[in-house]
Every structure is written in structure tokens, then in C-alpha cells.
């Protein structure tokens, strides 16, 4: 059993980072592992904390700068980033083999992806442009949004989008118009750097960029209801392997399986959550 440790973030360091005026404008596309030592993952949180147990480890393309990940119909769908390397892929789970791929032209920098109303949606980082595909990867439309694009998921009927701040926005899945927006908080404090998103059992799972943590968010209140500590996963790789940060959450609803990976990670992990700390 591999279970991650408790939060080790210092409250004093946390306050410094939370108050930085440039904290929301850090360049997501130039992330480097360990570049941010503090995070919105709060040591003072009174919410439950979950570690993990690795169920399976699957091959993953080590050249993929993973920005979005979903599971559907027995396959993984992955969005990758970097200028000139951004793509949307269909991937075989057991082998990691890329079965289908469509590349994004420059200057687009690929970001989060989701499947909603039988359409694949892919965001871009700073181009304020999203792409719509059918299941055969034919582009069938585009849409615009006024912010940066980071993560996106679907609650079954609406899109939910992050832009690296503490704000989540709900979009009409047909018109792509913003329906509502909501700040994400823990103990009244904003949780910034919301990145890759996944809708899991009525909660929004949000990877906190630059950290090993995933926030479990209530879509009703915007409050964090729990934290997932995935520290230790990246240590599964030899130090000579040039990996980047944790990024990529996919949920298999039919079989209740949770998958996670990271940018340039050579493995994708199926994990089971293990409660570490209960609500005080």
C-alpha cells in the first residue's frame, strides 16, 4: 500500500503566496516541477484529507505535456499542450498507445478537455478560443471566452471551466455562454490555481497547479469539502526521468475508477482514495 503523507505547507508561507499580486498570472504553460513551493492547499484546512493506494500503473506517453484527461467507452482521451505540440488524442488504456490524434495549429496552446453532450471540447491557454469535435475528431465548431483557459469538465448538462484563479464558471453546453460563476474557498479563503477539472460523483475535482493536491469542491457552494494528497506519486519514477507537474484526472463512472497522471509522466495511475484525516 502506498499512502501519501499529510499536508506540510506552512501557514506563514501560505499567506505570503496568497497575497502576492502576481499570483494569478503565473505562466501555466511554463510550469516547472518544484517551481512553486507554496500552494493554496492549506495546512489549516479542517476538511478531510485523502491519500491514495495505487491499483494499477499503465504506460503513458512521456512526451505528452498533459493538460486534460477523460475516460469514456473504454478509452482515455487526452489533451496536450506546448506550442507546436498541442493535440487531442484517443489513447488505449492498457498500452498507452495513441490510437487517434489531431494536432492544434500554432499559435494555439492546448489546455483542458471534456466530453459533453457527445461532443469533445478542448480549451486553449491564452487564445481565448475553444474547439469542438465530434467523436471522430472532426472539428465541428469553435467558441470564445474572455479569460485564460485552464481546465474544463461537464456535470452532465453544463460545462464547468477554470482559468487559474479561484473562480469556476458554468457554461451552457449548447451556446457556451456563461451561466454563473462561483469562487472556490476553504475556510473562507480563496483557493487559487484551479487547473485540470473532473466531475466525480457530484463533486468537482480540481488539480491545484504546481502542487500534488486535488481539491474536492461542492458545485453548490464552491466550498472545498476535502483534499486529495498525491505527494509521492512522482517519486515512482527514477530521478533521471525528466517529469513535470501532476496534471490529468479521469474518472470511469461505470467501474468507479480514478486515473491520474502528469506532464511528461511515463506512467498513468489508477488509484483508490484512502482517508487520512477526518473532519475535526
Where are these regions (language model features)?
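A short helix->beta-strand "capping" segment at the edge of beta-propeller domains
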Residues: 41-63, 93-99
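Surface loop/turn motifs at the tips and blade-to-blade linkers of beta-strand repeat domains
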Residues: 57-62, 101-106, 141-147, 182-189, ...
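Signature of short aromatic-glycine-proline-rich micro-motifs recurring in repeat-based ectodomains
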Residues: 66, 194-196, 241-251
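Conserved beta-strand positions in repeat-built beta-propeller and related beta-rich domains
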Residues: 77-83, 120-127, 161-165, 206-210, ...
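Blade-loop segments of beta-propeller domains
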Residues: 95-133, 137-149
Amino acid at each position: 500500500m502506498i499512502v501519501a503523507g499529510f499536508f506540510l505547507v506552512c501557514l506563514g508561507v501560505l499567506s505570503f503566496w496568497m497575497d502576492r499580486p502576481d499570483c494569478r498570472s503565473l505562466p501555466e504553460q511554463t510550469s516547472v516541477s518544484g517551481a512553486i513551493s507554496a500552494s493554496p492547499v492549506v495546512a489549516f484546512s479542517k476538511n478531510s484529507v485523502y491519500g491514495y493506494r495505487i491499483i494499477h500503473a499503465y504506460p503513458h506517453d512521456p512526451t505528452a505535456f498533459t493538460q486534460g484527461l477523460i475516460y469514456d467507452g473504454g478509452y482515455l482521451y487526452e489533451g496536450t499542450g506546448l506550442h507546436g505540440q498541442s493535440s487531442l488524442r484517443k489513447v488505449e488504456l492498457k498500452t498507452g498507445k495513441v490510437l487517434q490524434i489531431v494536432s492544434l495549429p500554432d499559435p494555439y496552446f492546448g489546455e483542458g478537455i471534456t466530453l459533453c453532450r457527445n461532443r469533445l471540447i478542448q480549451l486553449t491557454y491564452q487564445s481565448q478560443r475553444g474547439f469542438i469535435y465530434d467523436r471522430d475528431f472532426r472539428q465541428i465548431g469553435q467558441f470564445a471566452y474572455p479569460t485564460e483557459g485552464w481546465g474544463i469538465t461537464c456535470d452532465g448538462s453544463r460545462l464547468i471551466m477554470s482559468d487559474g484563479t479561484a473562480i469556476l464558471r458554468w457554461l451552457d453546453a449548447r451556446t457556451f455562454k456563461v451561466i454563473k460563476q462561483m469562487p472556490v474557498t476553504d475556510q473562507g479563503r480563496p483557493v487559487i490555481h484551479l487547473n485540470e477539472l473532473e466531475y466525480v460523483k457530484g463533486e468537482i475535482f480540481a488539480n491545484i497547479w504546481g502542487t500534488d493536491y486535488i481539491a474536492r469542491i461542492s458545485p453548490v457552494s464552491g466550498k472545498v469539502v476535502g483534499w486529495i494528497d498525491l505527494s509521492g506519486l512522482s517519486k515512482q519514477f527514477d530521478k533521471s526521468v525528466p517529469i513535470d507537474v501532476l496534471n490529468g484526472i479521469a474518472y470511469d463512472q461505470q467501474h468507479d475508477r480514478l486515473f491520474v497522471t502528469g506532464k511528461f509522466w511515463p506512467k498513468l495511475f489508477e488509484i483508490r482514495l484512502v482517508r487520512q484525516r477526518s473532519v475535526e
